[in-house]
Amino acid sequence: ELLGVTFDSYAGESFYNDKMGPIVEELKEKGLLKEDKGAMIVDLEPYGMPPALILRSDGATLYLTRDLAAAKYRKDTYNFDKSLYVVAYQQDLHFKQLFKVLELMGYTWAKDCEHVAFGMVSYEGQTLSTREGRVVYLDDLLHQAIQKARDIIEEKSPALENKEEIARQIGVGAVVFFVLYN
């Protein structure tokens, strides 16, 4: 809300659970899946990448399987002109593999998918990770930044008009700048 961002739709990872099986079947039908030590992979070595792991040896799906299903669903549902994945740079190989597998599946729109990489966000010397329980909520961070701006305004310019709105703009702007700069 503080950023003025709205979403037309929102789907979590589990939304794609029933869409992964058909993707695996399609990969099989197109002759792209190969067995490697019990796991199912798409060989990407001819393209200078390690194999794309689709199913673990126990049959479990992986992020790549889910992302393939999600990409196809989004194209089928929204018929996008461009699909941007704004994700940390550490996931660069994952997205190169994703886009290459989509291309090998014959999806010409794979060229319209792009990974927009950014640096990892850290707080108090640790990289944030939801899986590892190191989380700072954006709402909390924005409110802290606004409060800091409010405090500085009170100290330096107590007679300033529209202090609350200016503190909001400065606090939110500082957080946005920090994330984009880093």
Where are these regions (language model features)?
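Alpha-helical recognition segments enriched in aromatics with Gly/Pro capping
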Residues: 1-182
